[in-house]
Amino acid sequence: ANFLGLSPSAKEALKSKNYIIYEHDHKYLKNRDPARFSNFVAPAHELVNVEFYQKARKILCQSGFHANIVKRNLNLDNIESVGGNLWTEEALQMLEQLASREKKDSCAVMDSPISHKNTPTAVRYCEATNREYALCSGNNYHAFLEQLGANNTLVFFPQTPETLSRIVVESRMMGMKVITNKLVGATQESWFKLKGIDLIEKMREKREEIPELIIGLMS
């Protein structure tokens, strides 16, 4: 659950218990955006929830890139990268089907209203390099992946650090190339060289590894 929804008394009570933080969007920062600071390190007055992070049995991050940013800000030794994320078996089977489909020689661009997803820069890149592109959007997960996977390349230039980036991993699982910047955690994982079925199998392994890690920490 999102611990920001907890009351102060509930958070205080948890500090004496055995709990894990599955870190996602830099909740130790007031603005949640480490990109605003040099080397992603915020000044002390920009940190929040520090004691809650300190008292955790473990802070699980989604990539080594993500874990390093958290470590540089909090200087804690209870931080660990799980090196991936979780997809349902149903989603992985769907990605398997989409990986086998023929793809157009064009770029997929996520058409997002969220400013830090930086859709305009991806569009400008495609236009400047004379690449065909398709804007992909929608709330239906399957339909969105079908739009995405119809192309052979994802173009994505986020403005803030992506702890992993599900869209990048999903694109690789569908056998696509990825054009991005240095703000995507997934691209710095050793398994990122994999794509298609090989990467899908790696994420299947994560479905076993991550829960086993959590159970081990809580036992």
Annotate each PLM feature.
Residues 11-17, 50-55, 101, 170:
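Short, conserved loop/helix-junction motifs that constitute active-site signature segments
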Residues 14-43:
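Active-site proximal beta-strand in glycosyltransferases
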Residues 54-78, 118:
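A short, active-site helix/loop in glycosyltransferases that binds the activated sugar's phosphate group
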Residues 5, 27, 65-67, 185:
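Alpha-helix capping/helix-boundary segments
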Residues 1-11, 18-22, 155-156:
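Short N-terminal targeting/anchoring amphipathic segment
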Residues 149-219:
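Catalytic binding pocket for nucleotide-activated donors in carbohydrate/polymer assembly enzymes
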Residues 37-59, 68, 149:
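Membrane-proximal helix-turn-helix segments that form the acceptor-binding/catalytic region
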Residues 86-144:
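Conserved catalytic-core segment of nucleotide-activated headgroup transferases in glycan assembly
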